Amino acid sequence: MINVQTVLKVADNSGAVFVSCIRLLNSSSRVGAGVGDTITVVVKKNIIKKNIKKSKEVKKGQVCSAIILRTIKGVKRWGNFFLRSSSNSVALINKYYLPIGSRLLGPVFREIRTNL
């Protein structure tokens, strides 16, 4: 579960490395956000690259929206089958719910693909 002030890894090539959660937007429960939920984040650390377009560049301190891709808590599927990840990861999205980066790094759970 992701709560406020949780530090998360960014799993796309938008330029951000670490982000911190500042608000839970579309949470499936009152306890915290899980896989597939939308949160508001602030960029804590980024990579400066010279070949990134200015529209796709993410700066430190910038507030963005993100969708949760993986959590350490995991996802329960039918038959008591749990899927867990080794880190909490997000992908940055814009106001039209399109990803800022052009690639997603690492596995993406099936629950995200069916809900979106």
Curated annotation (Swiss-Prot):
Gene Ontology, cellular component aspect: cytosolic large ribosomal subunit; mitochondrion
Record-linked CDD domains: Ribosomal_uL14
Family from the record: Belongs to the universal ribosomal protein uL14 family.
Subcellular location per the Swiss-Prot or TrEMBL entry: Mitochondrion
Record protein name field: Large ribosomal subunit protein uL14m
Signal peptide: none
A GO term, aspect molecular function: structural constituent of ribosome
Primary gene name: RPL14
GO BP terms: translation
Alphabetized UniProt keyword annotations: Mitochondrion, Ribonucleoprotein, Ribosomal protein
